Amino acid sequence: MENHVSLKVVSPALYYAIQDLRAHTNNFLKNQKMKPLSPGHYIIQPSANSKVRSLITKQQHPRKVTLPCNCHFTIHHECNRGFSHRGTYYSPSGNKFRGIRECTESTVYETPMVREIRANLSTEDTNPIQLQPPESVESSQVLDRANDNRIEQDIDWTPFLEGLEKETRDILG
C-alpha cells in the first residue's frame, strides 16, 4: 500500500520530498528497538543491523581523566578549562586532557609586595613545641550567656511526678 499525503500538493517536487521523508521515517522506525527505562518511559535505540542512528541525543556523562601519575579526576562534561597537577598544566583538547608544559611559575598573580612578604615568612619553626594560648581565670562567655537564655518560670512539678509515679506502679504492680 502506498503512502498518501492529505496535503494539497502545490508542486511535484514538494510531493516527492514528503514521500521521501515518510519512507525514511518508516525505515528508521522499523530498524529501531524500544528499550524500557522505567515504567512508561522508553528510549529508541538502533538495532544491530540498523545503520541509522537514533534521533535522540545521547546523555553526556562527566569525563573521567587518568593522568600519567595514575591520579584520577572526574570533570564536568561542559568544563572546557585546563588544570594543573603536580607542576604540569593539562589543557583540554576534545574529550582528552593532555599535559602541555611544566609549570614553573605560580598560578597566583604575584606582585613585588607579595614576593617580599613571602620571602619574609619563615616556614621553619625552631621550637618543636607549639605554644598554646594562655588560660583565662575569668568565667567563659559561653556559660555566662547560657544563663541569659533560660526561661525563668515557677513550675510546680509535683502533679506531673505523682502522675508518673502512679502510672509506673500500675504497670509494674
From Swiss-Prot:
A zinc finger (unnamed) spans 69-85. The keyword Plastid does not apply. It is found in: Host cytoplasm. InterPro entries: Gemini_AL2. One of its GO terms (biological process) is symbiont-mediated suppression of host innate immune response. Changing residue 150 to W: In strain: Infectious clone pBCT028. Pfam families: Gemini_AL2. Changing residue 147 to D: In strain: Infectious clone pBCT028. Keywords: Host cytoplasm, Host-virus interaction, Inhibition of host innate immune response by virus, Metal-binding, Suppressor of RNA silencing, Viral immunoevasion, Zinc, Zinc-finger. Its main location: host cell. Changing residue 128 to Q: In strain: Infectious clone pBCT028. Belongs to the geminiviridae transcriptional activator protein family. Acts as a suppressor of RNA-mediated gene silencing, also known as post-transcriptional gene silencing (PTGS), a mechanism of plant viral defense that limits the accumulation of viral RNAs. Suppresses the host RNA silencing by inhibiting adenosine kinase 2 (ADK2), a kinase involved in a general methylation pathway. Also suppresses the host basal defense by interacting with and inhibiting SNF1 kinase, a key regulator of cell metabolism implicated in innate antiviral defense. Determines pathogenicity. The zinc finger is involved in PTGS suppression. Monomer. Interacting with and inactivating host adenosine kinase 2 (ADK2) in the cytoplasm. Interacts with and inhibits host SNF1 kinase. This is Protein C2.
